[in-house]
UniProtKB/Swiss-Prot annotation:
Signal peptide from the UniProt entry: 1-29
Modification Phosphoserine occurs at: 181
Function, in words: Specific inhibitor of cysteine proteinases. Probably involved in the regulation of endogenous processes and in defense against pests and pathogens.
Cystatin domain span: 46-135, 152-214
Protein name: Cysteine proteinase inhibitor 7
Organism whose genome encodes this protein: Arabidopsis thaliana (Mouse-ear cress)
Length: 232
């Protein structure tokens, strides 16, 4: 009887160990699976956001923009010349996908193009994925002549328009030059924008939200731009 009881005890111990081992593996697998899912969530791709690089004169963005124009010229046997980068946004992929709004010179005329460039810095890899001409939201000719006693009527324009954003940057710099504060202005938002034509020049009226130090301020500004692209 004692031998039989001892055998039964040993069998129960073995079964218990097997069950515990299986449960432990299940827990480990579950934890690993949970960790894997967490990593997947962390790596989910987001939308485009403003580039962290300085796109107003930043060397990295300028290099990517120049690559886009040169690659387009090579593919299409074109002779476009990069003038400047108007806007740069980026999206995290396997590397980064840059979306650039470019001002280029084509046959002596300024035109706006949008380029998408895929970059993997660790592989020294760049690929032009898209390069297309963008028709501006408005020009002097298509604003239309609407006499109101003073010339042209005001027209509401998109705050995302590259021309509006350039005018806002110019206005912010002008405010900074006139300011005696040690804190520089930072453009937070273009709240409203409208434009009209005055003697072959575009006049912008913008409501800007600016940050200076810890203080938010709103400014209504007017900016003039002539046909050569010069601001007043």
């Amino acid at each position: 009887m004692d031998m039989r009881r001892a055998s039964m005890c040993m069998m129960l111990i073995c079964v218990s160990l097997v069950l515990l081992s299986g449960f432990g593996q299940f827990v480990i697998c579950s934890e690993e699976k949970g960790t894997y899912n967490d990593n997947v969530v962390k790596m989910k791709l987001g939308g485009f956001s403003d580039s962290k690089n300085d796109w107003n004169g930043g060397k990295e963005i300028d290099d990517i923009a120049l690559f886009a124009v040169q690659e387009h010229n090579r593919r299409e046997n074109a002779v476009l010349e990069l003038a400047r980068v108007l806007k740069a946004t980026e999206q995290v992929v396997a590397g980064k996908l840059y979306r650039l709004t470019l001002e280029v010179i084509e046959a002596g005329e300024k035109k706006i193009y949008e380029a998408k460039v895929w970059v993997k810095p660790w592989m020294n890899f760049k690929q032009l994925q898209e390069f297309k001409n963008i028709i501006p939201s408005f020009t002097i000719s298509d604003l239309g002549f609407k006499p109101d006693g003073n010339g042209f009527d005001w027209r509401s324009v998109s705050t995302n328009n590259p021309e509006v954003q350039e005018a806002a940057k110019h206005a912010m710099k002008s405010l900074q030059q006139k300011s005696n504060s040690l804190f520089p202005y930072k453009l937070i938002d273009i709240i409203l924008a409208r434009a009209k034509v005055v003697e072959e020049r575009v006049k912008f009226e913008l409501l800007l939200k600016l940050e200076r130090g810890n203080k938010l301020e709103k400014f209504m500004v007017e900016v003039m731009k002539d046909q050569t692209g010069k601001y007043e």
